[in-house]
Amino acid sequence: VHLTADEKAAVTGLWGKVNVDEVGGEALGRLLVVYPWTQRFFDSFGDLSAASAVMGNPKVKAHGKKVLNSFSDGLKNLDNLKGTYAKLSELHCDKLHVDPENFRLLGNVLVCVLARHFGKEFTPQVQAAYQKVVSGVATALAHKYH
């Protein structure tokens, strides 16, 4: 992902304020609620029958935290996202058979959640920088599929 110095500063500056536990759980939860067909990959998570069940599900929250910790790794390696996510791409492609479009959807949901949490601080410029990052991460995660 090519970011200008200002974009990198915006992304890393805001990310330093992110509560990974909270934002991760909310982002994954929203993905499962807004795009319910994604729930099929999470059969072991128990009750996902209603939005309140999804958003309060401890397994959703725990996996959301794991996803965001992995996203943090990507932010530290923006120049090598394919390498950073090679093993995860292989896992999601070969073993889990996740539709790579879901990575793009989750990235967009993450941007929405960040906007909700940071309000006016999440300026259009910050959003544009984050869109570049989530797009790059989604592309890297989908790499094994090609």
Curated annotation (Swiss-Prot):
A single GO cellular-component term on record: blood microparticle
PTM-bearing positions, type N-acetylvaline: V1
Binding annotation for heme b: H63, H92
Keyword Chaperone: no
Modified residues (Phosphoserine): S44
Superkingdom classification of source: Eukaryota
Gene Ontology process terms (BP): hydrogen peroxide catabolic process
UniProt modified residues of type N6-acetyllysine: K59, K82, K144
Residues where Phosphothreonine is found: T12
S-nitrosocysteine found at: C93
Domain Globin: 2-146
UniProt note on tissues of expression: Red blood cells.
Keywords: Acetylation, Heme, Iron, Metal-binding, Oxygen transport, Phosphoprotein, S-nitrosylation, Transport
Similarity section: Belongs to the globin family.
Assembly behavior: Heterotetramer of two alpha chains and two beta chains.
Function according to Swiss-Prot or TrEMBL: Involved in oxygen transport from the lung to the various peripheral tissues.
Protein name: Hemoglobin subunit beta
Gene that encodes it: HBB
